[in-house]
């Protein structure tokens, strides 16, 4: 019976998605709003089921749940709920109000839940592909828009390449370790030097495939184009739930089956983290589109989170999880502001379009300013604490130079975040924006409240992240 309750959230998401798909297909009326609302309820129920699911390993080591997977799954569900709440008015305004949108989000989240809890390379790949197939369609969801079609094609081609590299890496690991089970791989690498050397080669390909999905440099080339070309409601989803799911998987893979060869991959992760922070900071400086700016910003944020992985300690994992949770809130708040940027029901995406917003719409300007300050890491906002925890973990693990580089790139990145604030408060511009929907206002308000008030009660998030990190790092986790 415990096995049933463990997989119940996945069954619930998949069955709910199929029911909504059938209801949309076999009814003549447009039920897109009702299906979107129902999807939000389904995700909330699924999050509750995921928290209540018993821990342990099932299906002969193919699937595992613990405090770490619960933490990541809840973040994924919250990201999807926020993205759906932001999508309703935006999709209607640009003419893509279709019931398939929330259904695809549900199927993508189903894949992410499988992904996060995978304890076998085969399960990992299945979850990876379930997620990817839904995301490919979402990227090109505005099929009559040239930029959206281009974004979908780029994401599909490069995503297929990353999947191929991942699968090739899995085959190499299986060839040298003789198993695809996480516990079996860890045992093989700890006891057989030859297997460790050969499997490390496969690990490089696995790491490349996963780095692509989180937009880590130098595998980031798709991110600015897809962020700009895809509908903003899709971009808001891409920037949150998929990145958290894949990053959680990355933590499990690197510190679980490949934990015994930490010394062989730590330098590579440091290089990827450093490259991501530098490219994210420098690449955004000359951007005029706020969506492309957010694309480069996400590259940098993944670099900071990778510092926690490079530390290879429980404190590093906890710091990375705290950073991801805060990044989730900041991203939803920022994309809520971007979705609210519309005049005459037409989206505006240039940073220059924000000119004069402080006088025309002071509440909007305040929320976006809070998000920008937080992403820049200015105390006492939540973004500062996210960086503080990963920097502290890196320094304690002997990665001082990487932490110093992180501080330098944070200063550089502050330039383009503050430029957005400068445009809103000091430049003259056009009349104000359209009236915001209740869903967008709710997401913006909740994100701003969390970002500002986090300093007064950080213990809840830090305690949960510490429990999750402990579950990942203990020997019984694998």
From Swiss-Prot:
GO terms for cellular component: plasma membrane. Keywords: Cell inner membrane, Cell membrane, Membrane, NAD, Quinone, Translocase, Transmembrane, Transmembrane helix, Transport, Ubiquinone. NDH-1 shuttles electrons from NADH, via FMN and iron-sulfur (Fe-S) centers, to quinones in the respiratory chain. The immediate electron acceptor for the enzyme in this species is believed to be ubiquinone. Couples the redox reaction to proton translocation (for every two electrons transferred, four hydrogen ions are translocated across the cytoplasmic membrane), and thus conserves the redox energy in a proton gradient. Its EC number is 7.1.1.-. NDH-1 is composed of 14 different subunits. Subunits NuoA, H, J, K, L, M, N constitute the membrane sector of the complex. HAMAP family: NDH1_NuoN_1 (MF_00445). GO terms for molecular function: NADH dehydrogenase (ubiquinone) activity; NADH:ubiquinone reductase (non-electrogenic) activity; quinone binding. It is an enzyme of class 7 (translocase). It catalyses: a quinone + NADH + 5 H(+)(in) = a quinol + NAD(+) + 4 H(+)(out). PANTHER family: NADH DEHYDROGENASE (PTHR22773). It comes from Acidiphilium cryptum (strain JF-5). The keyword Repeat does not apply. Belongs to the complex I subunit 2 family. It is found in: Cell inner membrane. It holds the Pfam family Proton_antipo_M. The chain crosses the membrane at residues 6-26, 33-53, 71-91, 99-119, 121-141, 156-176, 193-212, 244-264, 265-285, 299-319, 321-341, 364-384, 388-408, 438-458. It is a multi-pass membrane protein. InterPro entries: NADH-Q_OxRdtase_suN/2, ND/Mrp_TM. GO terms for biological process: ATP synthesis coupled electron transport. It comes from the Bacteria. This is NADH-quinone oxidoreductase subunit N 1.
């Amino acid at each position: 019976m415990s096995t049933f309750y463990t997989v119940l959230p996945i069954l619930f998401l998949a069955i709910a998605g199929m029911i909504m798909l059938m209801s949309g297909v076999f009814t003549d009326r447009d039920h897109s709003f009702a299906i979107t609302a129902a999807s939000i309820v389904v995700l909330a129920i699924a999050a509750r089921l995921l928290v209540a699911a018993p821990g342990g390993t099932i299906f002969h080591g193919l699937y595992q749940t613990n405090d770490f997977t619960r933490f990541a799954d809840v973040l994924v569900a919250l990201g999807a709920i926020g993205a759906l709440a932001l999508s309703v008015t935006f999709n209607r305004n640009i003419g893509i109000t279709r019931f398939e949108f929330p259904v695809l989000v549900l199927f993508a989240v189903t894949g992410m839940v499988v992904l996060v809890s995978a304890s076998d390379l085969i399960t990992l790949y299945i979850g990876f592909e379930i997620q990817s197939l839904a995301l490919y369609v979402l990227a090109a969801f505005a099929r009559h828009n040239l930029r959206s079609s281009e974004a979908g094609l780029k994401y599909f081609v490069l995503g297929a390449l990353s999947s191929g590299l991942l699968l090739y890496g899995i085959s190499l690991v299986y060839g040298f370790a003789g198993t695809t089970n996480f516990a079996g791989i860890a045992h093989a690498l700890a006891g057989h030097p030859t297997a460790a050397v050969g499997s490390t080669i496969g690990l490089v390909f696995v790491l490349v495939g996963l780095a692509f999905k989180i937009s880590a440099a130098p595998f980031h080339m798709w991110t600015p184009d897809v962020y700009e070309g895809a509908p903003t409601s899709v971009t808001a989803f891409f920037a949150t739930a998929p990145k958290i799911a894949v990053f959680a998987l990355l933590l499990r893979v690197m510190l679980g089956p490949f934990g015994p060869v930490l010394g062989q991959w730590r330098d590579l992760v440091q290089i990827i983290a450093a490259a991501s922070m530098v490219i994210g900071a420098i690449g955004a400086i000359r951007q005029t589109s706020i969506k492309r700016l957010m694309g480069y910003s996400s590259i940098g944020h993944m670099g900071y989170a990778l510092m926690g992985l490079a530390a290879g300690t429980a404190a590093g994992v906890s710091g990375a999880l705290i950073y991801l949770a805060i990044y989730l809130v900041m991203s939803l708040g920022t994309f809520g502001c971007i979705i609210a940027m519309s005049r005459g029901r037409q989206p505006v995406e240039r940073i220059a379009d924000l000119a004069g917003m402080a006088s025309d719409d002071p509440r909007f300007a305040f929320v976006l300013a809070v998000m920008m300050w937080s992403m820049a890491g200015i105390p006492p906002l939540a973004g500062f604490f996210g960086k503080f925890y990963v920097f502290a973990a890196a320094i304690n693990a002997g990665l001082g130079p990487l932490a110093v580089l992180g501080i330098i790139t944070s200063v550089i990145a502050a330039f383009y975040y503050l430029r957005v604030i400068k445009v809103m408060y000091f430049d003259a511009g056009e009349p104000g924006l359209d009236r915001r929907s209740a869903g967008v206002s709710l997401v913006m308000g909740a994100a701003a409240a969390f970002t500002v008030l986090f300093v007064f009660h950080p213990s809840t998030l830090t305690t949960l992240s510490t429990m999750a990190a402990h579950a990942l790092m203990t020997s019984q986790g694998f």
